[in-house]
Structures are given as structure tokens and as C-alpha cells.
């Protein structure tokens, strides 16, 4: 019974960012929360630059994947609302970058390599905290989703 209660509390705790007012608020809150987790992991990796790094914590991996999904959903929402292409592309890129850097951290051969992947995640998460509020002032959703989804993002940029 205690295990069930613990699982329920953990599930409730992970759902709290999802209760934010809007998807943009959720992305911002999740990014702010993840910054602390990534900072702890980064410091651990920096402490052992030439040694084999610690594995990526399962909680960090799951939380980053959830952030990537929320960023992707926000990109689609911006698209449907006819929002600026640059915002749509930024959040689509964040979704892709979260997965890419999480993979880089997981396969890193040294702490220095892993710290570099975490540094990129930190940079991206700080951008998410700063940029997500700009999505709040978009007009209501368009009814013609096909028109919005036809827009393409320009070439991607590596961090």
C-alpha cells in the first residue's frame, strides 16, 4: 500500500507542471524546473572530466522527453494559431534538440563530453524560459489547420 501511495504522489508531482494555464506556461515551468536537474547532472559530469561519466538519471531522461513532447505540441499549437514561423520553428527545434542532447549525454565516453551535452541542454532550457511567454499573446486557434501546417521551418542550427 505504501508503494502505491508513493507512486501516486510521484505521479501527482510530475503532473503539476501540466496544470499550468497554457501550454506555453507548461513549457516554461517545465524548462525552469529542468534547469536545476540538468545543473546537478552537469556538475557531476564536470567533476570527472576524463573519467567515464555517470549514466543519465532515468528521472532526468523522462522529464527531458516530456519537455520535448510539450515543446513539439507548442510548435503545433503556434502553427494552428497562425503564429510567427520563428516561434514555431524554435519550439520544434527545442523538441529535436532535447532528444539529441539527451542521447549525447547518454553515450558520452567522458565526463567532459557529457558536461558539454548538458551545457547545450542548459542553454536551450534557458531559452525556453525566456521565449515561452511570447507565445501567450497569439490569436485564437485557426480553423484551417492544413494551411498552418503547410509552413516549413528553415534550415536547423546546431547549438
Regions found by a protein language model. Name each.
Residues 16-21:
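Sec/Tat signal peptide C-region and signal peptidase I cleavage site
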